[in-house]
């Protein structure tokens, strides 16, 4: 699911630039040449994180680090248990429970990778259908004609329209002589005209920018 971001970079002209591979044998996870996804076991509940090593002089992202806790899968499995209530006298795990949990993990991987490339939460993305993996999604369920829950589209697959826009804004190269400030404003206006909105958990003010 981390490769979902490749769609956004290909859209602005970077073919196959965003790749995910198994760490080479003998490589150290702290080697700055490698962006890392760490699968971490915890004995207690913990958050997943997406962070980066950044050059403070230029803002360049040098290395991305994602940490995914093992208990998140258990949490998602319990959500599925609560929704499906598969309680019988047999120890059978419905495949839909497993698929629901794995679908959420795939979405989470893309979310945390989004942070490593500089993209913040967008807690308004859910007001524009499924516009971003950078929101905190709940499972979207439907009722069938016989009043059974349908799980097929509980979580989305792929990044959303807002994610595509954010990558375009942050990474698009412009031809020499382009008024970049105007070009970036046009990207913002394109999103607004499409109905996309943005709110995050960080506060930016003009005073903070001046400091």
Region annotations inferred by a language model:
Residues 2-110, 116, 139-143:
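Metzincin-family zinc-dependent endopeptidase catalytic domain
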Residues 9, 59, 73, 118, ...:
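Aromatic-residue detector
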Residues 53, 67, 122, 132-133:
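Residue-level preference for alpha-helix termini and adjacent loops
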Residues 111, 118, 207-210:
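Alpha-helical hinge/cap motifs
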Residues 115-126:
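Catalytic Zn2+-binding segment of zinc metalloproteases
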Residues 126-206, 211:
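Conserved catalytic/binding loops enriched for acidic/polar residues
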């Amino acid at each position: 699911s981390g490769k979902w971001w490749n769609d956004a970079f290909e859209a602005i002209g970077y073919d196959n630039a965003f790749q995910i591979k198994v760490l080479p044998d003998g490589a150290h996870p702290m080697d700055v040449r490698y962006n890392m996804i760490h699968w971490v076991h915890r004995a207690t509940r913990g958050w997943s994180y997406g962070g980066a090593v950044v050059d403070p002089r230029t803002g360049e992202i040098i290395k991305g680090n994602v940490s995914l806790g093992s208990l998140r899968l258990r949490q998602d499995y319990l959500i599925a248990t609560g929704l499906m209530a598969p309680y019988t006298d047999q120890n059978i795990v419905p495949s839909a429970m497993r698929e629901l949990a794995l679908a959420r993990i795939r979405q989470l991987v893309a979310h945390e990778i989004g942070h490593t490339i500089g993209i913040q939460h967008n807690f308004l993305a859910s007001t524009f259908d499924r516009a971003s993996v950078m929101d905190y999604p709940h499972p979207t369920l439907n009722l069938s004609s016989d009043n059974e829950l349908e799980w097929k589209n509980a979580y989305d697959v792929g990044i959303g329209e807002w994610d595509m826009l954010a990558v375009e804004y942050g990474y698009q190269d412009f031809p020499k002589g382009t008024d970049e400030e105007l070009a970036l404003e046009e990207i913002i206006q394109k999103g607004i005209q499409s109905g996309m909105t943005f709110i995050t958990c960080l506060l930016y003010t003009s005073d903070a920018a001046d400091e």
